[in-house]
Amino acid sequence: MTLAHRAVGDIRRGGFRQLRNYVDMCSSLAKRPQQKDFFAYAQKALQRTDSCYYSLVHNLLDTVDEDRLCTVGVNMGFGGLIYGASEMKKQADVDGKPFSWITAAHCGDPALPALVAAAEKKGSFVWVLDATEGDPSEAASLAKAFPKCAFGVLAAPEALTPDRVAQLAECLNVVVLPLLQSPELTPDVCHAARALKAKQMLYMLTVLVDDTCAEEACLLYTSPSPRD
């Protein structure tokens, strides 16, 4: 975690040149083909000075609590993609079966605590919890019980009330995923985004798209976050 905070501080001070330096360093240290491919893509994306990734990183550093950013980064990056995926790959080679480093489940399922505990032992630390038909704040108790995991909480924007957002904000290992039925920043979406931003939370607008609205979704992706 100390290294994560140091990296964030370096990028704050050194700007995007330092970001490229970190990506180059990680690329040189990558051992597995998937890791090499990931950092090769990151290098390519950062070659363009007008890349939307620069504004994305700048926005993250300005609006997201640093402890939250580092916790999610370590839990997902190291726990999920480096250590966890390597452990699951070993077992997959023995079993001869494919594996996934991310698991989806229904938020509030009473079986989840036991399932998450069992998954941790196998190297699985990243979850997406579907709360689109319920109360997204139910994820808070699970996230607190498993601080080494990262939880993405998929929720309807109108369900992300200030009170529920406040409960989720107590968990540094949660990423909120407001689900948009179309690439449109409706009043409910904007209200949810403002509530999340007020708590310096990490969130990603998640859009359901098909061929008819894919281009519109790309424009939404490159737009600034909803503002007051």
What is the predicted function of each stretch?
Residues 116, 139-143, 165-166, 189-193:
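Generic structural signal for well-ordered alpha-helices
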Residues 41-105:
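N-terminal [4Fe-4S]-dependent radical SAM core
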Residues 1-45:
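Long terminal accessory regions outside catalytic cores
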Residues 88-93, 115, 164-165:
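Short, charged beta->alpha transition segments
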